[in-house]
Regions:
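Conserved small/polar residues in nucleotide/adenosyl-binding loops
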Residues: 264-265
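Core AdoMet radical
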Residues: 209-216, 232-243
């Protein structure tokens, strides 16, 4: 259980509550509540996870939209979180592709495929890292190895021969997790998805430590369908067993039965 899990669950909880309340409220009232959600999920005026509480709320705002199946907005123009709510409120509406999205201003722009010397370097006499480098990119500064990134071609030979494992291969977590080599970098060094290659497996989402990658959901539309009397059949993925903690299987089974009984009344 991580901070990312907590935020994700808070967003889903609030969006679900909003969907159930919609049956008794106008679109304008729900839109007003949507605008208040980032302040409810991220209270106070002191940042908890990032350098600014405003950034935290902006990211949560994008997560709220994606949880409702709506497209991201970005921060380059003035828009409200609730823009497009009326269209998204229809139970038959499908989320707008792509499924997997990168919140650019949440991305840490992690370095990718970079070799760096750590403080584990012993400054040994043999200097195998320097001797094997085909581009003469390694020198010694204060008796410690130093890699010139302008010359380095990321061949990894120094990494392989260091007897102290003092050279670290830094890779971007989301890119390392992607089996389709679909993640590159934009002009600012932030992660960027090539949707021609992406298969929406979600591995990048799971492995991003900054929670900058999120998927779209239709929980809002599903609840609308339930409220309006549509026949909704839940199909539970087997993976749910490991997602809600110990002792949750029986409780969830009873919850599903209760939902069904509520619909039949």
């Amino acid at each position: 259980y991580t901070n990312l899990t907590e935020i994700r669950r808070k967003v889903f909880k609030e969006v679900s509550a909003l969907a159930y309340e919609k049956a008794d409220k106008s679109v304008d009232e729900i839109a007003h509540q949507m605008e208040e959600l980032p302040y409810k999920i991220i209270p106070g005026d002191i940042a908890t996870y990032r350098e600014s509480v405003f950034l935290e709320r902006a990211i949560v705002g994008e997560r709220i939209r994606m949880t409702m199946g709506m497209p991201m907005q970005g921060v380059d123009q003035p828009e409200q979180i609730s823009d497009g709510l009326e269209e998204a409120s229809r139970p038959e509406v499908y989320y707008q592709p792509p499924l997997i999205n990168i919140v650019k201003f949440a991305c840490n722009a992690c370095e990718d495929n970079v070799y760096r010397v750590t403080n584990a370097c012993q400054g040994c006499l043999a200097h195998p890292c320097r001797e094997i480098c085909p581009k003469e990119a390694i020198s010694f500064v204060d008796k410690k190895a130093y890699i010139d990134q302008e010359k380095c071609i990321q061949c990894g030979m120094c990494f392989k021969v260091c007897p102290y494992q003092a050279i670290h291969h830094h890779v971007r977590p989301c890119a390392a997790a992607c089996g389709m080599d679909a993640i590159g970098s934009d002009e600012h060094g932030r992660a960027d998805i090539d949707y021609e290659k992406c298969v929406s497996c979600g591995q990048c989402l799971v492995n991003c430590p900054f929670g900058a990658i999120a998927d779209k959901s239709q929980i809002f539309q599903v609840i609308q369908a339930i409220n309006e009397g549509y026949t909704v059949v839940p199909i539970v993925a087997p993976s749910f067993v490991g997602q809600f903690g110990k002792g949750s299987v029986g409780r969830l089974r009873e919850a599903f039965k209760e939902i069904r009984r509520s619909e039949e009344r």
